[in-house]
Amino acid sequence: MNPPSGPRVPPSPTQEPSCMATPAPPSWWDSSQSSISSLGRLPSISPTAPGTWAAAWVPLPTVDVPDHAHYTLGTVILLVGLTGMLGNLTVIYTFCRSRSLRTPANMFIINLAVSDFLMSFTQAPVFFTSSLYKQWLFGETGCEFYAFCGALFGISSMITLTAIALDRYLVITRPLATFGVASKRRAAFVLLGVWLYALAWSLPPFFGWSAYVPEGLLTSCSWDYMSFTPAVRAYTMLLCCFVFFLPLLIIIYCYIFIFRAIRETGRALQTFGACKGNGESLWQRQRLQSECKMAKIMLLVILLFVLSWAPYSAVALVAFAGYAHVLTPYMSSVPAVIAKASAIHNPIIYAITHPKYRVAIAQHLPCLGVLLGVSRRHSRPYPSYRSTHRSTLTSHTSNLSWISIRRRQESLGSESEVGWTHMEAAAVWGAAQQANGRSLYGQGLEDLEAKAPPRPQGHEAETPGKTKGLIPSQDPRM
């Protein structure tokens, strides 16, 4: 099935290829596009209605580029696909097996890994195979399905990242408004909305609004952003706005206020620690630093995803502006490969920077734990991993705000169901002070102790997690 050597030109009505019964080239490949083999420009391909592809199979057109260009792109996409499939499958397995990682907030990360895995699984093998033969091999239906999967899973990943940013924004900057909500149920509804939103933007090309067509080196498919028709241009602009730019603005807005809230809470804890003069504030600051690190990790994930899709969006906008004739096959294919490479960023980032993920890998996949350099003592399961939130919500009984939070949480369910982090609990504490009209900065030790209820006898010097003779992770109350 290899194409003949020498210059490749699209089949003409007067020259019948040996592999076809009736030489009827697709309607989107007309004589006006015959210069593609000499100029290396993209054809204007727009099968916007059923039946525009030939009824009998015909060889799709090729572009006049060196063979090694196809092989290079094919090799890159194969490596990207294998890395994306194995890496994201590892993330899914680890997060599902590790109890400490099965929190409502991490449901979004699992969904992101599922979306990235499906992106790699549906895109890389097809792209690689077509690159070996230097032309699209799977016909109209295969092209449409391939492009639909790329759009669906790419949009799902972008909107999932937006949902992560919004979720962190709400629980950190609006803790009282979200306190007590069934987080797992809420996360499930949000993820359902994410997939419905992605589906709503992926289906229109099947109904005549734009189309799914070959692109670049004509070994992969995407939505038609090259045609300069009102319908195609409208779809391209709306897709870029509501799938790329609007989510990007929401993410930027959320993380600006997230880091501002972290900074303000850190100052509040520092002031409180100066008033109390003990080790509690130091422990709280360490937890705050941990939350800040996790926020930075997610911000890095989002930035890499945006940078991966930015070149592809730029190419689409160039064509939208009417300059499709300046786009070469390379200028379309290379950004497409970069966009698909966004599926490999998350597993690599987690493996390098996410401490609990590294430990969970060492526990459930010891061979990978050795590769990541996780020590043997860190790979042993700890009792404290059964809930990542208990130590914070039970370690501050000397303060009435912490006791109120704990009592209310017990009435609502376990920490694993509520899904609060150290940062969120600290934010509730500060927000509760502000809601009562009191400034956290102006409260001294006397004010805080006056509010605290009497402690049980025999526990004046004890706090949960600091029971005599026990380290925090061994406290039976945790």
Curated annotation (Swiss-Prot):
Compartment list: Cell membrane; Cell projection, Axon; Cell projection, Dendrite; Perikaryon
Principal localisation: membrane
InterPro entries, per the entry: GPCR_opsins (IPR050125), GPCR_Rhodpsn (IPR000276), GPCR_Rhodpsn_7TM (IPR017452), Opsin (IPR001760), Retinal_BS (IPR027430)
Family matches, as SUPFAM superfamilies: Family A G protein-coupled receptor-like (SSF81321)
One cellular component term from this protein's GO annotations in UniProt: dendrite
Biased composition (Pro residues): 1-14
Keyword Lipid biosynthesis: no
Membrane topology, as annotated: Multi-pass membrane protein
Composition-biased stretches (Basic and acidic residues): 448-465
Regions of this protein lying in the Extracellular compartment: 1-72, 129-144, 210-238, 318-332
Pfam families: 7tm_1
Disulfide bonds listed in the record: C143-C221
Record's function text: Photoreceptor that binds cis-retinaldehydes. Contributes to pupillar reflex, photoentrainment and other non-image forming responses to light. May be involved in the optokinetic visual tracking response. May be involved in the regulation of retinal hyaloid vessel growth and regression.
Name of the protein in question: Melanopsin
Natural source organism: Homo sapiens
GN (gene name): OPN4
